Amino acid sequence: MAKKDYYEILGVPKTADEREIKKAYKRLAMKFHPDRNQGDKEAEAKFKEIKEAYEILTDAQKRAAYDQYGHAAFEQGGMGGGGFGGGFGNGADFSDIFGDVFGDIFGGGRGRRASRGADLRYNMELTLEEAVRGVTKEIRIPTLEECEVCHGSGAKPGSQPQTCPTCHGAGQVQMRQGFFAVQQTCPHCQGRGTLIKDPCNSCHGHGRIEKTKTLSVKIPAGVDTGDRIRLAGEGEAGEQGAPAGDLYVQVQVKQHPIFEREGNNLYCEVPINFAMAALGGEIEVPTLDGRVMLKVPSETQTGKLFRMRGKGVKSVRGGAQGDLLCRVVVETPVGLNDRQKALLQELQESFGGPTGEKNSPRSKSFFDGVKKFFDDLTR
């Protein structure tokens, strides 16, 4: 019976990277693990199939060989003289000829080292005030931690993992493939070089247990959306005493009702009435440090920016503090009573109408442009 494609076993495309392959393996291994399917021979066979596919596709050299030659790259006789040796003499060094493809598949391989723990990611949402000032937050994350009973060995206290009698601790076995020898993962110990005869009752021989741990994370002042904080060694525990992975805290800053942030500068809109815009005055504006007075000069136009130095965000990497830029928005009055309408009518007449040249230079420029446009059309 033909063996199933390794990519199909893990449910990943042939273009999948190592991260995608590991994610698929972890999901399937949890589903079909013998400890969760005791007595289920079909699940046990599926688990072995998944593990075999994972070991091949996460080894760069073996994956390259599989992509080029399929299962024949690893099966007894699959790469014999007919497959590779037809054009070479008996004295050829096949490990040199095919080294670029197979790497350390040829020659004396080494056992699989215990894997470093996986890195973890935590998405943390902050308010703008928390991001600007810095904050310490407690988080809870599900992870794999070293078993406290066996200290990660997987063996019951008082016992030790035994050297694999098949590979004698090498983690690999040598098989003859036509004119040369090929190293394969030891099928007895799955490449670890050791066997656990008496597994730990707490972790069932895995050396790690699932836990949810609480961490206190210090967020420095000045962080922004997209910043990432690394907590070394706070990821998943490694296998058999290998180093733990890292935890990466990904920052996301919530939208603020008043301020917008661009780099280390803050922006806000300040509405003023048209009388203040024309005559000038002072208005109270918010900052992250409290309220301050902004002086508005006379004849201020809508969209005018006023810079308040040092009222922005201090860079997380040090250096000068950003500024607060207040954008003035001149509001048109609404809900006018008869007296206010009469006063405005009188004011407009004093301007010489809607396009008064002296008091509304932009209006004059605009209407002059409109007149020229229509004059040009009629010529």
Curated annotation (Swiss-Prot):
SUPFAM superfamilies reported in the protein's UniProt record: Chaperone J-domain, DnaJ/Hsp40 cysteine-rich domain, HSP40/DnaJ peptide-binding domain
| Location of the J domain | 5-70
Q: Where are the zinc fingers (CR-type)?
A: 134-212
Q: Name one GO cellular component term.
A: cytoplasm
Q: Which CDD domains match?
A: DnaJ (cd06257), DnaJ_C (cd10747), DnaJ_zf (cd10719)
Primary localization: cytoplasm
Kindly state which keywords UniProt assigns to this record, in alphabetical order.
Chaperone, Cytoplasm, DNA replication, Metal-binding, Repeat, Stress response, Zinc, Zinc-finger
Note whether Chaperone occurs among the keywords: yes
User: Where do the annotations place Zn(2+) 1 binding?
Assistant: 147, 150, 200, 203
UniProt cofactor(s): Zn(2+)
Instruction: Quote the cofactor binding remark.
Output: Binds 2 Zn(2+) ions per monomer.
| Sequence positions that bind Zn(2+) 2 | 164, 167, 186, 189
Task: Read off the Gene3D superfamilies from this record.
Answer: DnaJ domain, Heat shock protein DnaJ, cysteine-rich domain, Urease metallochaperone UreE, N-terminal domain
Q: Which GO terms describe its biological process?
A: chaperone cofactor-dependent protein refolding; DNA replication; protein refolding; response to heat
Asked if Cell membrane is a keyword of the record, the answer is no
Q: Where are CXXCXGXG motif repeat segments found?
A: 147-154, 164-171, 186-193, 200-207
Where in or outside the cell it occurs: the entry states:
Cytoplasm
A GO molecular function held by the record? ATP binding
Top-level division of the source organism's lineage: Bacteria
Domain notes per entry:
The J domain is necessary and sufficient to stimulate DnaK ATPase activity. Zinc center 1 plays an important role in the autonomous, DnaK-independent chaperone activity of DnaJ. Zinc center 2 is essential for interaction with DnaK and for DnaJ activity.
Q: What is the protein's quaternary organization?
A: Homodimer.
Purpose of the protein: Participates actively in the response to hyperosmotic and heat shock by preventing the aggregation of stress-denatured proteins and by disaggregating proteins, also in an autonomous, DnaK-independent fashion. Unfolded proteins bind initially to DnaJ; upon interaction with the DnaJ-bound protein, DnaK hydrolyzes its bound ATP, resulting in the formation of a stable complex. GrpE releases ADP from DnaK; ATP binding to DnaK triggers the release of the substrate protein, thus completing the reaction cycle.
Which family does the UniProt entry place this protein in? Answer: Belongs to the DnaJ family.
Name assigned to this protein:
Chaperone protein DnaJ
- Per the UniProt record, the source organism is Cronobacter sakazakii (strain ATCC BAA-894)
Gene, per the UniProt record: dnaJ
